[in-house]
């Protein structure tokens, strides 16, 4: 039994009777549509690869307030540094989402839950292979991409399982598209630590999690 003193981690009951721990961050891919509505996001994403080493730092909240991996109702999005244009700002947001994802793993690790094992990415964001590679780099671990990554496919697996073992049915239906290995020479750890420091300095991120995130970087 793991207790979360901040109450930001919760569990869903799985159909197989187990519990699935998780959290819902207010930062995510929705910020791209919010900031660049009506734009060709694929085209921006392609141009953003040239700014992998940007010094622009972004905390990509979609709206006011954060709920995971820390609770901060007054938290607001920010972007620090001068950019060369939309493509660099887009790159900073992609990195910011990946940094928040890493902070989520750091918090779960701080609570004492295992975070090792195979990591599979799902959802619409997996259509961008470069962003998936970025996430592998920031997380410093391999990520698996599957052929069908949409939530509707998960519902199809549940329907197909019936009274069979869900894990067995999922293993039969899910097909791996690619496995992306992390590139350790990309230098994201320093920028991640910068973001942790900015969140802590604003009083949103607690000292204990900030120290743990730095120690794991």
Which ranges hold each PLM region?
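Active-site core segments that coordinate phosphate-bearing ligands/cofactors
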Residues: 1-120, 127-151, 156-217
